[in-house]
Curated annotation (Swiss-Prot):
A double ring-shaped homohexamer of HslV is capped on each side by a ring-shaped HslU homohexamer. The assembly of the HslU/HslV complex is dependent on binding of ATP. This is ATP-dependent protease subunit HslV. It holds the Pfam family Proteasome. Na(+) binds at residues 162, 165, 168. It is found in: Cytoplasm. Its EC number is 3.4.25.2. Transmembrane segments: none annotated.
Length: 185
């Protein structure tokens, strides 16, 4: 198995709220070595959600680098993502890292790849990893046909992905950012 794809990370945005979640399974080839890994983190003053699919050590390196870019760009998600991919493409060590990041703040959701891609997917849904397509399909259906909030959609979609993808389990970590309602005067 290519470690690059062995997980499911999903982010859903609706209204003034965004949720990002992932499963907890870590595999080494065809063996489950951990069922409760935490692949989703809060970065930059708790204002950015990030999840990874890929090699665990590589992902921690990328989280650290990305948080540094967020600090450098004062929390500007898009500028930090572009800066990270520039380094990722050109640095000899970073170029070998096998991971993808799904990141979101209150305004934007992105996929960041080692190929230098910074993608803002349609419909406010980001999905990466081996179960990503299953989770994305479920989330699109839930977004279109229910009034569920983002956290509930992420949970239900990850459950569906876990039922279908052998590299995804039912141990979920879900983080949520809510933009407070503007104060009316």
């Amino acid at each position: 198995m290519d470690s690059y794809h062995g997980t499911t990370i999903l982010s859903v945005r609706r209204g003034r709220e965004v949720a990002l979640g992932g499963d907890g399974q870590v595999t080494l080839g065809s063996i489950v070595v951990k069922a409760s890994a935490r692949k989703v983190r809060r970065l930059y003053k708790e204002q950015v959600l990030a999840g990874f699919a890929g090699a665990t050590a590589d992902a921690f390196t990328l989280f650290e680098r990305f948080e540094g870019k967020l600090e450098k760009h004062q929390g500007n998600l898009v500028r930090a993502a572009i800066d990270l991919t520039r380094d990722w493409r050109t640095d000899r060590v970073l170029r070998r890292l096998e991971a993808m990041l799904a990141v979101a703040d209150r305004d934007t959701s992105l996929i960041i790849t080692g190929n230098g891609d910074v993608l803002e997917p349609e419909h406010g849904i980001v999905a990466i990893g081996s179960g990503g397509a299953y989770a994305q399909a479920a989330a699109r259906a839930l977004l279109a046909h229910t009034t569920l909030g983002p956290a509930e959609m992420v949970k239900k979609s990850l459950e569906i992905a876990g039922d279908l993808c052998i590299y995804t389990n039912q141990h979920h970590t879900i983080e949520v950012l809510t933009d407070p309602e503007p104060v009316s005067q």
